[in-house]
Amino acid sequence: MSIESKAYHLIQPGEFEYTTINHEFRDGDVIVNPSKASVCHADLRYYTGNRRKEALDKKLPMALFHEGIGTIEDSKHPDYQKGDKVVIVPNIPSRLRAGDFEETDLLDNYDENAVFMGSGYDGICQDRMVVPGDNIVKIPDTLDEDVALLAELCSVSLFPINQLKEITTKSSPQVAVFGDGPVGYLAATALHYIYGIEIENLIVFGAIEEKLQSFENFATTHLVFDYDFNSHKGVHTVFECCGGKFSESAINQAIDLIDRQGQIVLMGVTEDLVGINTRDVLEKGLTLSGSSRSTKHEFEQLIASFENEEYQQALKKLIPDEYYDIHSTEDLKKAMDDTAAHKGWKKTYLRYHWS
């Protein structure tokens, strides 16, 4: 069975086009009507053209956005029914896709034949999405849907924490986060509210004092400019959440800071090559690992964890005071232009009105 969806395609940086998309609706699938989406920096990189030309040529035209919620219009999956409010899990592994793909023992977010919404595969900027039923998670009636809309962003920070065998040790009881933006904030909140890392053992380094003040209810904070990283003892794990032009300095400060046989998790995205102090990586016996995206497990874990009122209050600092109401390509362009021009700390939320 085929269904038609209205969509806004990004056809080139800065330009959207209203179009229609056809989807096959198969057994095990659900039709979701996206109601709200949240803008990610990855979306902005496509919109502003801040991606390599070959990536833009390969992936556009495309419907943006991978952070979204919606309501089920129809279901061929036994666990979901019409009217359910759901969070959309954007990574569709090959085992859930139509087609003949080689089996893999890789995690879903590292499956080479997976597709990811808003990254070479049409995302949440459409009125009807057909997704596997295993790619959604129900939103409880008691949960604020604006908090639920943060699930994807939270999941990206939670996934690498879940992968670690141990976050701390007896002799190195501390965890550090580099980055005072949303990714660092969500990594720190997960470490405190889900994993129970206490304030005195959770250290956040940043460059802007006003941003660091938002962390002070659950973490110890320091500015990077005047901190003596080499003299600090007690950190076993560091999460690098800076990205961009700050990746190199953050990684090397983390190498200076961390105890021997510690672990550094790289989460910040940069388009540039960075120089790393490999001599001290070797001398200290450090482990560096990368992390990208997440799995459905993190979404389920988060929806359950969002029941914690203190966690909810911490997350609400990222929720904007107003939505952008999207009736047309002009509305969408304004929302993206504003977001690109004013890269504030709070998220940009879009509310769809399809005619």
Model-found features: residue ranges?
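Residue-level marker of beta-strand positions
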Residues: 67-69, 84-85, 128, 180, ...
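C-terminal hydrophobic helical "lid"/dimerization subdomain
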Residues: 2-3, 227, 252, 296-355
